[in-house]
Amino acid sequence: DWELIAIDDHSTDLSCKILSEYQKKDNRIKVFKNLKNGIIDALRLALEKSNGSYITRMDADDIMANIKLEELIQLLLKHKKGHVATGYIKYFSTNKKLNDGYLNYEKWLNCLTAEHSNFSEIYKECVIPSPCWMISKSDLIQIGGFNTNTYPEDYDLAFRMYYGKLKVIGSKNILHYWRDYPERTSRTNPVYSNNTFPKIKINYFLKNELNQKKMLLLWGAGKKSKAIAHLLVQNKIEFSWITNNPKKIGKTIYGRKIFNCNTFEVPENSQLIIAIASKSFQPILKLATIKDTYRFC
C-alpha cells in the first residue's frame, strides 16, 4: 500500500487543481498547500502529514520508474532498519541537450550505487540522489528529519544519513528519471550555487572529522581550494597550504603562504584535504600514503 502526500509550494500552473481532482477519486492521494515557502518547509509539512512507515520523495517534474517503490521497499524489508535504499538515476531533458556535468554526475553516482559505496565519497558531492531514496520513517526522524535549515538540503540530509551510521543499499535498475531544464530550482536559486558546497563540507568536517592532534594539510590552490582555505581561516583553524602549481607556490592568500607540495616536509601524523578538480590530477606518493584523507573535489 502507499500514500501520496502532494505539497503545493505556491505553484502557478494547474498542478494543484489536477491533483485535487485525483484526490477525490483516490483517498490515498492527499494534497496540502505550503503556507510557508520553499522546499524545506514543503518537506517538513509532507513528513508531518505522512502516515506510512517508509518515506521517499521526488519533485513533481521528474518521472519514476514503474518498479521504483516496489524495488526500494523490498530492499528495506530485506535489510531492515539502519539502511537507506537508492537506485540508478538517469537525467533527461525535453528542450535542451544535457551538459557533461550532469552526465558525469549520473555516471559517478550510479557507479557508487552499484557498489553500495556512496558514502565513501561523501565530501566530493551529494552521494544520495535527492529524488531517489527510501528510508524508514523512524530512521529519518532519528537523524533529524527535515528540521535543519541548511542548503543544499539534499546534501545536508546525505551527511546526516552518513553520520547517523545508516548503510546504503542500492539497486542496479534505473529507478528515477531526473529532469533538467533552464528554470530548474537548482539552477536559479542561489542557495544551490557551488558557493554553498564548500561551507557545508567544512561545517561537517570540523564537527566530525578534524583532529586537533594532527597537522591539517590543504592541497590545491584553485578556486575551490581558495574557498575552503577562506572558511578554515574564518573558523581559526590551523593548516598548511600546499600545491604543485608553480604559479601559486610562494604566494600568500588570506594570510597563508602556499608551499610546494613536492618539497614540503609532511608530518607522519597528518590530515589531508584534497581540493583539486583537475581530471589529470595525480597523487604524490608521500601524500597518497596519508590515511586520513578527504577528497573535496
Question: Which role fits each region the language model picked out?
Answer:
Residues Y88, L103-E125:
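Short, flexible, basic/aromatic active-site loop/helix in glycosyltransferases
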Residues Y88, V168-L175:
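Catalytic beta-strand/loop signature of glycosyltransferases that borders the donor
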